[in-house]
């Protein structure tokens, strides 16, 4: 017994770090860990409560006063949100010496709603309704905020729970955006939970309702939506074509399914959080003792999902949303790593006016991710012209054998692009890879003769229609679609 007490005393008697005010102390116990964020157990001496001490490595994200100002604006937003269904945000500060940003939030005893649901599989429908009401109250608060706030990455991994009280709260607001105008204009989030209008980068707060519907689907099936898909491009294709996830067919209860379908309706028919709170499905029925039932999902014998969600956080000129690293849990052990897709965005601003004259009204951006095995990258080049034609080009990049210039030349040749685009594309590829691979040197590798290193999408033939076309050109796989005036009208 004394040995056990001594062990606890050594763990908790000394802080390893204290905040500038002296109020919060950090212990060395890791609650969870992502690629850039580590969560430690902390203590609030004023209130006498345990807290979550979140530490984000900034690396090169803070490169200018503008980016720092933007980061502070986000922190200010999080501090101003006060609601019982929103995670409490206590304090934050920048550690310039160690290039960290630290922020303190409330700590949840049971981790995320997804973890909690996988742990407790036998749940009455009343519990699910209770969770839904709490989440919708939080969304209604965000959406009626002045200005309205869109979460943009709502999923069960970002909803936290204190299981001993049944208290559910929305967290991880790093992708949240204040809606200063009628629409937002960045494609961010997790593909399985993203509404069709998000892919067209013009949307409002109703995208959170769509994501909420997918959360309810996940609650009752244990699966991520679109678990039948193997990568984001397949999900994208199904979403923009209006095809619902196969998991919806597993929902046996017609009342539950009907409620989910209301959330997943087209934006013109989709209800607000306030309207959904008045829905008959969420009415309290003391006599309703049904268990949540669905066909068996993609879960192994240990209760672990067989596929993790993908994630598309938004970066802009090096700015990093501080809550982005979502895949961690309060377990004190090694965190289960998810198959996240970390996408970054690089925009080359040199000689912007001269480039605009040559490229006209074409907007070009590039994003990338590391491959799961760590020995290569996947990149996506996106172009949008003044007519609203969007062209997404996916391709692998081998950091050992490829160079930016060789791949750019190959792309221009395979896709019959303007030869003058080679240098611009190569520069953008180099810039993006430099942000993904810290030791990357521009033009450091010999030119590659490889035509294909892997595949992003499995298309057996070209398929064209109203929602887009897909083609394969060597290593390059292309999706194109048009944003028309009629499309925009439908989503208003």
UniProtKB/Swiss-Prot annotation:
Catalytic reaction(s) noted: L-seryl-[protein] + ATP = O-phospho-L-seryl-[protein] + ADP + H(+); L-threonyl-[protein] + ATP = O-phospho-L-threonyl-[protein] + ADP + H(+)
Keywords from the named record: ATP-binding, Kinase, Nucleotide-binding, Serine/threonine-protein kinase, Transferase
GO biological process assignments: protein phosphorylation
Family annotation (SUPFAM superfamilies): Protein kinase-like (PK-like) (SSF56112)
GO molecular function, a single term: protein kinase activity
Protein kinase domain residues: 25-282
Binding site for ATP: 105-108, 155
Family assignment from sequence similarity: Belongs to the protein kinase superfamily. Ser/Thr protein kinase family. WNK subfamily.
The protein, known as: Probable serine/threonine-protein kinase WNK9
């Amino acid at each position: 017994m004394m040995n056990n007490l001594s062990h606890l005393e050594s763990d908790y008697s000394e802080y390893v770090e204290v905040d500038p005010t002296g109020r919060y102390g950090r212990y060395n116990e890791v609650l969870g860990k992502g690629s850039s964020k580590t969560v430690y157990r902390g203590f609030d001496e004023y209130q006498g409560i345990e807290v979550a001490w979140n530490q984000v490595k900034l690396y090169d994200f803070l490169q200018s006063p503008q980016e720092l100002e933007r980061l502070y604006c986000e922190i200010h937003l999080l501090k101003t949100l006060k609601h019982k269904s929103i995670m409490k945000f206590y304090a934050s500060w920048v550690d310039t010496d160690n290039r960290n940003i630290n922020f303190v939030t409330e700590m949840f005893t049971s981790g995320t709603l997804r973890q909690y649901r996988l742990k407790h599989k036998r749940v009455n429908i009343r519990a699910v309704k209770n969770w839904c009401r709490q989440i919708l109250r939080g969304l209604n608060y965000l959406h009626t905020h002045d200005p309205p706030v869109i979460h943009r990455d709502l999923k069960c991994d970002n909803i936290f729970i204190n299981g001993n009280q049944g208290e559910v709260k929305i967290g991880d607001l790093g992708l949240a955006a204040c809606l200063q105008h009628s629409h937002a204009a960045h494609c961010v989030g997790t593909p399985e939970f993203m509404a069709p209008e998000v892919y067209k980068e013009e949307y409002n707060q109703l995208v959170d309702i769509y994501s909420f519907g997918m959360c309810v689907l996940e609650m009752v099936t244990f699966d991520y939506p679109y678990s039948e898909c193997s990568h984001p491009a397949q999900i994208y294709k199904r979403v923009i074509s209006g095809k619902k996830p196969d998991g919806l067919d597993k929902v046996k209860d017609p009342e539950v399914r009907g409620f989910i379908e209301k959330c997943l309706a087209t934006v013109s028919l989709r209800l607000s959080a306030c309207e959904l709170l008045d829905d008959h499905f969420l009415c309290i029925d003391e006599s309703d003792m049904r268990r949540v039932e669905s066909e068996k999902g993609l879960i192994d014998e240990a209760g672990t999902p067989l596929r993790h969600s993908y994630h598309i956080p938004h970066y802009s000129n090096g700015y990093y949303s501080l809550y982005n690293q979502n895949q961690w849990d309060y377990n004190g052990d090694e965190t289960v790593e998810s198959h996240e897709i970390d996408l970054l965005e690089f925009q080359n601003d040199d000689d912007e006016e001269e480039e605009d004259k040559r490229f006209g009204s074409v907007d070009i951006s590039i994003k990338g991710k590391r491959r799961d095995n760590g020995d290569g990258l996947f990149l996506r080049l996106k172009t949008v012209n003044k007519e609203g034609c969007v062209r997404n080009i996916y391709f692998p990049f081998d950091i050992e054998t490829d160079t930016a210039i060789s791949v750019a030349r190959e792309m221009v040749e395979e896709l019959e692009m303007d030869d003058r685009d080679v240098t611009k594309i190569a520069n953008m590829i180099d810039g993006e890879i430099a942000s993904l691979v810290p030791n990357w040197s521009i033009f450091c590798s010999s030119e590659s003769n490889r035509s294909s290193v892997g595949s992003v999408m499995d298309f057996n033939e070209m398929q064209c229609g109203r929602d887009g076309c897909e083609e394969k050109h060597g290593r390059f796989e292309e999706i194109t679609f048009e944003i028309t005036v009629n499309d925009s009208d439908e989503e208003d």
